[in-house]
Amino acid sequence: MDFTRDDNSSDERENDVDANTNNRHEKKGYHRHTNEQIHRLETYFKECPHPDEFQRRLLGEELNLKPKQIKFWFQNKRTQAKSHNEKADNAALRAENIKIRRENESMEDALNNVVCPPCGGRGPGREDQLRHLQKLRAQNAYLKDEYERVSNYLKQYGGHSMHNVEATPYLHGPSNHASTSKNRPALYGTSSNRLPEPSSIFRGPYTRGNMNTTAPPQPRKPLEMQNFQPLSQLEKIAMLEAAEKAVSEVLSLIQMDDTMWKKSSIDDRLVIDPGLYEKYFTKTNTNGRPESSKDVVVVQMDAGNLIDIFLTAEKWARLFPTIVNEAKTIHVLDSVDHRGKTFSRVIYEQLHILSPLVPPREFMILRTCQQIEDNVWMIADVSCHLPNIEFDLSFPICTKRPSGVLIQALPHGFSKVTWIEHVVVNDNRVRPHKLYRDLLYGGFGYGARRWTVTLERTCERLIFSTSVPALPNNDNPGVVQTIRGRNSVMHLGERMLRNFAWMMKMVNKLDFSPQSETNNSGIRIGVRINNEAGQPPGLIVCAGSSLSLPLPPVQVYDFLKNLEVRHQWDVLCHGNPATEAARFVTGSNPRNTVSFLEPSIRDINTKLMILQDSFKDALGGMVAYAPMDLNTACAAISGDIDPTTIPILPSGFMISRDGRPSEGEAEGGSYTLLTVAFQILVSGPSYSPDTNLEVSATTVNTLISSTVQRIKAMLKCE
């Protein structure tokens, strides 16, 4: 019996051991997910790497897995991804470390083997360099002491200033090719090139009353006359590195749609989140107000042609005539080889828009084009510094952070353009006028939207101007009977718009301040001498005034284009109605036209025609016009002469939304900023140095004032 009981106990223990062993094997068993489950889990992980309990339960029901299995899979996946990223980062850091180490070795070799350029021997040693540096510091301290001693002596004995600043300003003229203008400042003295001082030009009540005759600062030398030193090898390397960083940053900004960009609280446009930007990118300038914007447009132009225009300063200025006032390529960092993948330029550009009240912006930018993939190119801009460069302003008011465009080639000659503008503006130095403050602060001034709207319009104009084999049906050719005549008129209109937009800067201006109105800027008068083809040679007085109207821009634009009422405000009509002699559409919008107008003047001696070019876009519009005698108009209409030789002196109107948010977004807002500008030829090339411009100033002041009052009365905005 005892042996039987022992045997039974032994059997039970063996059974228990076998059961425990089986349970242990069952606990250690692995469950492999199916390929469908893994694919679904990985897809979900890309969208949400940290699902909550509810999401895990739903996903488990979908895949027939327990929530705990889902939880453990996501934990393992996150650990695996983190490990993979760390390995990739370590590999990149090791490669960068090796690269830097090799660069240091090459620099050390170069320093050890440096030679003296004059004699070809070994360069100075470390001790010689320190001795020379101490000598320079001692000389610098001595010169500072001498400067202080002489300055104190002059102050004590009433001496004059140590530097002489020329008071007479240079006077500019517009250029047919933005960066090659020869109509540059000339000092006018006792010779035929001397212009009287402002105090002798404007006498009488203007200097004592409501006219500001403070002489502006002396402008810079023309770019073609400035001495640009060749870039050293180190400067080229530094610029190429900056260009690479700019391309990378702009590409990241475009790809980070949801995280980096947010909607503006003012007008729902996309702006960069400053907090995230400081987190992801290195700040280059924090002393100012950042402006950022992004816009996308599809234009009818081949991507290759767009890239060529962006990299050629003269073509760039012609493509954006109402924004780019001047542009010039300063340095080419590599050869223009479109089969290559990357090429860079150093470009000077001056931007100006809408009104003399809007301060221009000057940049020295590094522009880089890089092919990202097939049919996709990135063009990035970033501010760069060159020594001994003269600007119109004695101090820059803007710095361009990495900005640019992504160009994607589309079928049938179209291109998709994604535009990013990111600048830092120092408003403390040049504060914009209150009329345009909302426009500039809201981003509608120099923002991406203005660039894309202008790009779309000018691309359409190029198509309508150059790719038309015969007179289109939507044109009203009238007196123009040939396609050559049409092309001549279109070219004249384009040049007139460009010259009118250039004139708006009015660097050398004198102000008539407003007497009482709060929505008027007063009248600004500028004087310049023109010596180049395309405009009448001689002394020209230009004047402009800006005002706010409680009407949408489209209504103001249609009013200025209305021929039935034009004779009531246009002095060129002499009170007689005008008819349309010819009209050509310049874009998909039938309101954008270039036309010849003919006032019904009976006297054949005073009979003339008016060339008018006008456009309207999402941000405003422009109406520019110039009078022509019948012989000149007939020559332009025939197309038998070069249109660039026909002199044009345009006047007109700049129309803009005011930048304030409104419900009438489709019509450009409920308020309009209108700038009226006229030009008068005072005398021909042989003007007298004693010319008194008081009569001309009075005439143009009266002309501007009366035109503004008539327009306001007709629009019932008094």
From Swiss-Prot:
Family: Belongs to the HD-ZIP homeobox family. Class IV subfamily.
Regions of compositional bias (Basic and acidic residues) in chain numbering: 1-12
The protein's role, per its UniProt record: Probable transcription factor that binds to the DNA sequence 5'-GCATTAAATGCGCA-3'.
Residue ranges with Polar residues bias: 176-194
Name listed for the protein in its UniProt record: Homeobox-leucine zipper protein HDG9
Domain of life: Eukaryota
Tissue-level expression: Expressed in anthers with highest levels in the tapetum and pollen grains, and chalazal end of the embryo sac.
Subcellular location: Nucleus
InterPro entries: GLABRA2/ANL2/PDF2/ATML1-like, HD, Homeodomain-like_sf, START-like_dom_sf, START_lipid-bd_dom
Segments for region (Disordered): 1-35, 169-209
GO cellular component: nucleus
MF term (GO), any: DNA-binding transcription factor activity
Gene3D superfamilies reported for this sequence: 3.30.530.20, Homeodomain-like
